[in-house]
Amino acid sequence: MSTEPGYASPVVNVASSLPRRAAASTVLIVPVVSTGDDDKPGAVVASAGSFLSSDAVAEIESGLRALAATGGAEQLHRLVVGSLPVSSVLTVGLGKPRSEWPADTVRRAAGVAARSLSNTETVFTTLAALPGEGVASAAVEGLILGSYRFTEFRSAKTAPKDKGLQKITVLATAKDAKQEVAHGAAVATAVATARDLVNTPPSHLFPDEFAKRARALGESVGLEVEVLDEKALQKGGYGGILGVGQGSSRPPRLVRLIHRGSRLAKKSKQAKKVALVGKGVTFDTGGISIKPAASMHHMTSDMGGAAAVIATVALAAQLQLPIDVIATVPMAENMPSGTAQRPGDVLTQYGGTTVEVQNTDAEGRLILADAIVRACEDNPDYLIETSTLTGAQTVALGARIPGVMGSDEFRDRVAAISQRVGENGWPMPLPDELKEDLKSTVADLSNISGQRFAGMLVAGVFLREFIADGVGWAHIDVAGPAYNTGSPWGYSPKGATGVPTRTMFAVLEDIAANG
């Protein structure tokens, strides 16, 4: 999907059996389960073993016995199995046996397996043969996302010596296997595109360049694209975007990407319209209210919401969802300088609301407010906004769980879908009394409250002020989940994760199917 240098997803196909003779550096990934007894070895899952001869299964289980491998969740063991036409077999543990497997269990197992591979160009897997809804798609997603690497800025001295995973063959015979596998590959590639954008350093991805990449990606899949430069923003009255960007020598942008999918619907007049909004602060120093230096370099990820939105709307066009999807993406760099906005300044948001800027490091909500008002002018049925908005999200929910706020019914719908796809968004309230803390003596609103507590919810309450009446909306705060500062886990690498791309696309699919 990406039109710029970055991660090239492996080629994915489906086969009903292993080849008679496989190429060198070929690995077969086989799921195994535990017996529940730590003294007994793991066993090959029966459905996954249906693609293997009884001799091959016996050889694998003999190897597990020799290694005292129990089949515990995400345990990996490499075996040489002479009766199979592959260089080696990689078993991945799933834990206790189940009659049906949750998709994210399979996705994580595939991701762990993929991350362990080196000098491996071709993978076969029987993971898709596991019983359970969506497991074939999940297996492919996990393999692609687990094998992700970002090497664009590495010289020959430090770049990986191998090519990385080039080809995935999914062993499956189900009627819809090819369709499910293709869907999983498309979704994972979109997530990889979002990761590439977030991992690109701010020296190379600033508002104008970000807008150019969004345009190139959008046009490559047939989206309508509109880019507003600083002059157009000034003329249009986008005070929030301009205020945040005025301290930088690299001026802000507003990008609009439009997928007109309703024309693909059987009943086009009944097709829903969805607005997507994503925070695109390409680097956030905090401005005059400057951040501590120790972790400021992580603020290369402060456009993670924008990256996910751009990848999502492009995927909607690529897979031709029969609904209208309109992405509105504000892009700015928040820098301290003689021209930067100051604490105490008052700016006028797009649409006329005035805001007192009490803290220049609460800048994301200022650019989002402009974008939300503009997005609501399109009269959407639903609006999904996502942003790396508050450190309070991580304090409240940790580094892996997004906070989901918004109108109650749609918030709960988005959170449930997020949990289903394994991104684990959690519904949070927006108490009305928090609005009192956003009162200003000189403007309509302040951009922060005077309280230490509930920072994630306060930001959501601020954004709610700009949502048009009657629009079902959700705000997904991914301050922690969008960027993994710790060790890799599951199918998540260190650095950009691409969250919440899969959540947003799954919500779009649900709206297309159910309204």
UniProtKB/Swiss-Prot annotation:
HAMAP family: Cytosol_peptidase_M17
Keyword rRNA processing: no
Positions bound to Mn(2+) 1: D284, D361, E363
GO terms for biological process, alphabetical: proteolysis
InterPro entries for the chain: Leucine_aapep/pepB, Macro_dom-like, Peptidase_M17_C, Peptidase_M17_leu_NH2_pept, Peptidase_M17_N
Cofactor(s) this protein cannot do without: Mn(2+)
Family per record: Belongs to the peptidase M17 family.
Pfam families, sorted: Peptidase_M17, Peptidase_M17_N
Protein name: Probable cytosol aminopeptidase
PROSITE patterns: CYTOSOL_AP
Gene3D superfamilies: Leucine Aminopeptidase, subunit E, domain 1, Zn peptidases
List of catalytic residues: K291, R365
Keywords: Aminopeptidase, Cytoplasm, Hydrolase, Manganese, Metal-binding, Protease
CC cofactor note: Binds 2 manganese ions per subunit.
CDD domains: Peptidase_M17 (cd00433)
GO CC terms: cytoplasm
UniProt EC number: 3.4.11.1, 3.4.11.10
Annotated GO MF terms: manganese ion binding; metalloaminopeptidase activity
Compartment(s): Cytoplasm
UniProt xrefs under PANTHER family: CYTOSOL AMINOPEPTIDASE (PTHR11963:SF23), LEUCINE AMINOPEPTIDASE-RELATED (PTHR11963)
UniProt binding sites for Mn(2+) 2: K279, D284, D302, E363
Reaction equation(s) it catalyzes: Release of an N-terminal amino acid, Xaa-|-Yaa-, in which Xaa is preferably Leu, but may be other amino acids including Pro although not Arg or Lys, and Yaa may be Pro. Amino acid amides and methyl esters are also readily hydrolyzed, but rates on arylamides are exceedingly low; Release of an N-terminal amino acid, preferentially leucine, but not glutamic or aspartic acids
Main location, first listed in the record: cytoplasm
Known function: Presumably involved in the processing and regular turnover of intracellular proteins. Catalyzes the removal of unsubstituted N-terminal amino acids from various peptides.
